[in-house]
A protein has these predicted regions:
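Membrane-embedded alpha-helical bundles of multi-pass integral membrane proteins
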Residues: 2-281
Length: 281
């Protein structure tokens, strides 16, 4: 890999090293995320204990079936398929997103094993996953914003419309896919211009499309786009992370825990106790 473009770890703007932002953004975001999670967990910590560590084998089976295999999603076929694409795309791309955060501090960082043939397989899957997720998000946004399926409509019993939140989440996801693809495409386009062996981009993917679009742009343009797309990805990634616990999409984080600790027997929900004082909690 030829370092034809400066990375966020070595670049500077008006004499200010951008690596400062590469450190400050995740540190501030993780601190804020920890604070938000602590606030969300406070009521659970005060709640009556309910032992859910029994039958671990059955609980692991539920994780594999309900969470990982997305067993229940095809109940609503179109929405279910889109959800499955986005879910598995996120699982695949989580490694790349984490890698990018670290690359902003250490330009040559690669997760162990990804500098071998396993990396070739992973990055191929990553390119197609990002593209599939992007188009799934576009279709989901069109369904939610234009066609508006009946089950998304809110009645007097459920008057709060969460369409804005769903659209914002879809925007965050699309922005992550586009910015990651642009970051890589700008670098590969610079390699092509220099006549060196370019890094492989899977055909018919977002990165491949952007590379073909950018290959005739100036070196300065590619450099600026490389840096800009990195920090767009960084800011959107951590903004999304901190936004999730504050809305209905908190399940993106909690779903694996919800499934593991789900009730294994029906009809054993404890009744709500009203009028409990702070001291009795």
């Amino acid at each position: 890999m030829e370092p034809l473009l400066e990375s966020p770890a070595t670049f500077d703007i008006f004499g200010i090293p951008t690596v400062i932002f590469s450190v400050l953004i995740p540190v501030a975001a993780v601190a804020l995320f920890a604070y938000i999670i602590a606030k969300r967990l406070a009521p659970i910590v005060k709640a009556r204990p309910d032992f859910r560590f029994d039958r671990p084998a059955e609980r692991v089976k539920n994780i594999l079936k309900i969470w990982l295999a997305q067993w229940r999603q095809p109940r609503y076929m179109m929405a279910g398929v889109l959800h499955i694409i986005i879910f598995f795309g996120f699982l695949i791309l989580s490694v790349r997103s984490t890698e990018l955060v670290i690359k902003g501090i250490s330009a040559d960082f690669v997760f162990p094993g990804l500098n071998t043939f396993l990396g070739d397989i992973y990055y191929l899957l990553k390119d197609y996953a990002a593209t599939a997720v992007f188009f799934a998000v576009v279709i989901a946004a069109i369904r939610r914003g234009i066609f508006k399926p009946e089950r998304y409509q809110y009645t007097e019993a459920y008057p709060h419309d969460h369409t804005w939140e769903a659209m914002l989440v879809l925007f965050f996801i699309a922005a992550l896919m586009v910015s990651e693809s642009l970051f890589e495409a700008a670098h590969v386009a610079a390699q092509v211009q220099a006549g060196v062996q370019p890094d492989f981009l899977a055909p018919a993917t977002l990165g491949w499309f952007f590379k073909n679009l950018l290959v005739d742009e100036s070196h300065a343009m590619l450099q600026n786009l490389h840096i800009l797309s990195y920090y767009v990805h960084d800011i959107v990634f951590f903004t999304f992370l901190c936004f999730l616990p504050m809305g209905k999409h908190f399940h993106v984080i909690t779903s694996i825990f919800n499934v593991y600790f789900m009730r294994l027997e029906k009809g054993n929900i404890r009744p709500v106790r009203y009028g409990v004082s702070e001291e009795e909690l």
